[in-house]
Amino acid sequence: MSTSTAEPSGLDNVRHRARAASSISTDTAPEAVTEKEREARPNKTYGRTPDGTVFVVPETHDMVSQLLDPREPKNLSDVLVLAILALHIWAAYALPSSLKRPIFALIFLFWRASYNVGIGYLLTVQSNYKLMVIWAKRMQLFENPSTGKNPRPWLYQLLQNELEAKIPKDYKMAEAPLEYNTWLVFRRVVDLILMCDFVSYCLFAIVCAHKPVSEGFAIAAARWVIGIALVGFNLWVKLDAHRVVKDYAWYWGDFFYLIEQELTFDGVFEMAPHPMYSIGYAGYYGISMMAASYDVLFISILAHAAQFAFLAIVENPHIEKTYNPPPPRQRAESEVSSSEATAESFRKSTKTPSTPLPVHNMVGVHNFDPFRITDYTSVLLVGCFAALALVTPSTPIYQALFVVNAIVWRLWYSVGLGVILTKQSNEKMFTRHFLKFGETAAEAWRQWKGMYHLSMTLCYVSFLAACWKMYNYPADWGYGWVLLKHVVGISLVALQIWTATSIYESLGEFGWFYGDFFFDSTGKLTYKSIYRFLNNPERVIGTAGLWGMALITWSSPIFLIALIGHILTLGFISYVEKPHMQKIYGENLRQEAGLTKFIKRSLPEPVKGLQMSVDKVWEDSKHFFDDFVDVARTKLGAGSSTIARDTSALFNKYPARLTLSRISPDLAGYDPKHYSISMEGTPLVGADEKATGKESANARVSKAVKTKVFEYGAPIRVKWTAPANHSKKDWVGLYMVTDNRSREVTEVPTLGRWVPARPSQYDTTTDEGIVSWDQPAKSPCPEVDFVQGEMVFEGDKLWWTQGVFEFRYHHNSGHNVMAISEPFEVRLAKVDDEDTEVTGPREVEAALLPIVRNCLDRDPDIAPATVEERFGAHVERDSKYAKRVVYAIHHMFGVEFAPAVVPADGDVRKLAWRICSAKEVLAPYSMSQRLQSPSTPVRDKFPDSL
C-alpha cells in the first residue's frame, strides 16, 4: 500500500538516470556541434557540459572488453593494469601459506577503500566543486602544446595516444571538451581500482577455500550449485545493467556532463532498488559458499556494507541535486486565482487562519519525546518487559508464558487493529466514538496513532522477550551451522529494518498510520522507493526479521510465532488493506509491480500457462476463505466500539592549539600596519539605544564609539586594503571574538566561514563571496602601492547565532593574522519585552518577515517577499533553514518551536499565528507580565509605622 502524496522520484541509483534530457540546460552557449551536423548524424549521442557546449559522445566499451578482448586496441594503461593483476596472481602463488590470508585480506581492503573512499572522495568534490575539472585545467593537462602554454608536452602526447587509441571514432582529444577528457582519464583510474578490487577478492576467496570436515556429498553439491547460480545471477545483473545504462552512467558520467537523450530502463532495474549495489553483490555470497569460509563471508558483508555507504553518501546526494532539484517557489500572484470567488476565499482565510497544525511525528528514535504520553508509556512498558525477561528464570513455564504473551500481542496487532480499521473504513466507527464525546476527528486520529504505535511496540518487544527466553548461547560457535544461522538471521533482521524504513520514507506519517482510513485522501497513489518494485513489501520481506530471529534462536516456538505473524500479515493485507484500497482508489490501483512484470516477461510460454492455471485455482479457492472470514469478522467485531484506549546539546569542537610562529619566513617584507579591514551590514533598528534605566541584561553603559550591531542573518560586506605585493592566497575569516586568545595567530578553524582575497586560488566554491579584488587604492604611504578588494559573507559563511564577532585577514593560506576588524555584534531584536508594542498577528508578521528572509538567504527561490508567499521547497529538503528560523523565533518572541514547524506552516502568516497562539497560552507564565509590578514588596517589608 502506498498512499503518499509526494512526487515519485524514480531515481534509485547513479546507474539509473531516468530524466537526463530534462536536466540539461538549454541556455545559449558556445556549441561544438552545429545543427547541420546533428541532422547528418541522427544516431549519435550528444552531451552537454555545464557551460552549454554540445559535443558528440563517442562510443566506448566496457573495461573487461578493453582489457581482455584481443580485438580491442591496447595501450600503455592496459599493460599497466594487466601487470598489476598479474602481480596479484603471482603473490597468491608465491607467498607462504601462513601469510596468504592476512596479506590478501589487507590487499582487498586496500582496493575496496580505494573504491569507496578514494573514488567516493573524487566524485564528491567533482559533484560539489567540479574539482577534478579544475585540477585538469590548472595542470593544463589538455592544453595543446602548439599554443606554448602546456608545461608538460610529453604528458599531453601520452594522454592523447592513450585516449585516442581507445576511441578510434568521433574523438579527438584536442577538440573534445575539458569535462569529457577529464572523465576519460578518471575512467582509467576507475578501471584499475575495480579490476584490482575484483581480482584481489577472488584471490582471497581462493586462498581461504577449503572443504569442511565431515561434509557430505549432498551438502557440498548444494553449496557449489547455489554458489555457481549466485555468481551466474550476479554476472547477468552486471551485464544487463551495463546494457541499459552504458558506460555513461557506469562510470558516473553525469558528474562531469549530461547526455542529451532519454534513457530507457528495464530488465534488472525493474527487479530491485539499487540493483548494482543490492542484488548486484549476490556473487559475493556465492563465492563465499563455494569457498566454505566465514572469513570470505564476513569480508563480503563488510564490502557490501561499504558499498551501501558509498551509495548513501556519494551517489544519492548527487542524484537529488542533478535530477530532482527543488521546484521553484510559488509566487503570491501564481497562488491566487483571478476569479472573484477564489480571491474572496483567500481573503477570508487570511483573516481567520485555522489553528496551527501539529507537526510532532511519532515514528523513529529522533522523534522520541519523553513528555508525550505515548512515548512515555512505551518506555515504561518496554522497561517492564525487559526487566521480566532478565530477572525471571528460563524454565519451561516462564518460556511458555512469554511465548503465549508474544502470540497474544501479535493477534491483537494484526486481528484486533485489523477489525478496528475495517469498521473505520466501512462506518467510521473509531472517529464516531470520539465525536460522541464531543471530541474532533483530529483527536480521534491522534488517539489512533498512539494506539497503533503502542500496539506495534509491544508486539515486537514481547516477541523479542520470548526470543530471549528461548535463546541458548552457543558453547561452540564453530560447531555445525551455528555461526551461519546467526549471520543469516541478523541479515534478515536488517532486511526487515530496511524494509520498514523504506516504507515509512515512502508513505510518511500519514500512510504509516493508515491515514486514508480516517481522512479523505486528496493525493494520488504513488509508487516510489520500494513500491516501485513490490506492491506489498510486507507480504514477503516485511516479516523477514521474524524468521531471522527464529533462525538465531533455533527454537520451534519462535518458528511458530514467526509463522503465525507471517500468516496474520498476509491476512491483514488481503482482508483489511486491499478492500479499503480498492474502495478508495479503484482502477487507479496497479495490478503488477515492477518485479512481477519482469518475472512474468522472462518466463517461457509453458511456464506462463502453468502460472495462469495456478492463479485460477487460487482465485476459486479464495472465495471459500472470504466467506469464512466475513462470518468471523462479524463476530470478532462485536463490541469493538468499546475498545479505548529533543533534547539537544551544541558542542563546538576545536582542534589542538596551533604552534605556528608569528615570525614566519614568508612574512618577511610584509608589515601588518599596511593591512586594514572594515565591514558594512544591515544595522539593527534601534540598536544605538542601548543605555536604559533598567537594572537588567538590556542595560548598557553609553560610550562615544558605538559598536556596530547588525541584523541576524543579514549579508555583511567586507572591504580590505593590502600592499600591491600581497600574497595571492590571502584570505579573510569570520570568528567569534572570544574564540581566539592571540591577536597574531588564529587558533581555531573557520568551519567554512572564509573567503579568499583573490579568485581561482583555492579548489572550492569559496570564490562565490568575492566581489572585487586588487583594485588600485589610495596610498597612505608614498613608498608602498596599495590595492583593495571587497567580498560578501552570507548564507553558510555566517554564524547563525547571536554574539560578538570579528573578521581576520590572513597571509598566504596560513593562519598568521595581518589585520583584524573592529568587533561587531549580531543580535535579534526582542519583541517580547514590556516596552515593545506588539499587540497582534500583524505586528508579529511585520517583525518576522525580514528575519525569515534573512534566514532563507534572501534567495528569491526560497525566501518569500510577502507574508502570504510560500517558502521554497529547499526549506523541506535542508533542515538548516528551519533551524535558523526557530532559533530567531525563540530569541525574538520567547517561544520555542521544533524545526519541523517551519516547513509544515510554509509561510510567515501561519508562523505568526502559531507564535501568537503559543504566546497566548504561555501568557499567564510570562515574566513580562510580572515585570509590570514592583520587583520588591516594599510596603510589606518596610511598614509605614516604621
Curated annotation (Swiss-Prot):
GO molecular function: phosphatidylethanolamine N-methyltransferase activity
Membrane topology: Multi-pass membrane protein
Catalysed reaction, written as an equation: a 1,2-diacyl-sn-glycero-3-phosphoethanolamine + S-adenosyl-L-methionine = a 1,2-diacyl-sn-glycero-3-phospho-N-methylethanolamine + S-adenosyl-L-homocysteine + H(+)
Biased composition (Low complexity): 335-344
Coarse class of the protein's main subcellular location: endoplasmic reticulum
Chain segments carrying region Disordered: 1-51, 322-355
Pathway: Phospholipid metabolism; phosphatidylcholine biosynthesis
Biased composition (Basic and acidic residues): 33-42
EC numbers, comma separated: 2.1.1.17
Bilayer-crossing regions: 79-99, 103-123, 189-209, 217-237, 267-287, 294-314, 378-398, 401-421, 448-468, 477-497, 556-576
Lumenal compartment spans: 1-78, 124-188, 238-266, 315-377, 422-447, 498-555
Gene3D superfamilies in the cross-refs: 2.60.40.2840
Cytoplasmic face residues: 100-102, 210-216, 288-293, 399-400, 469-476, 577-946
Enzyme class: transferase
Claim: Signal is one of the keywords in the record: no
Places the protein is found: Endoplasmic reticulum membrane
Biological process annotations from GO: methylation; phosphatidylcholine biosynthetic process
Gene Ontology annotations for the cellular component aspect, listed alphabetically: cortical endoplasmic reticulum; endoplasmic reticulum membrane; perinuclear endoplasmic reticulum
Function: Catalyzes the first step of the methylation pathway of phosphatidylcholine biosynthesis, the SAM-dependent methylation of phosphatidylethanolamine (PE) to phosphatidylmonomethylethanolamine (PMME).
Name of the protein this chain belongs to: Phosphatidylethanolamine N-methyltransferase
Biological source species: Chaetomium globosum (strain ATCC 6205 / CBS 148.51 / DSM 1962 / NBRC 6347 / NRRL 1970) (Soil fungus)
Gene this chain is encoded by: CHO2
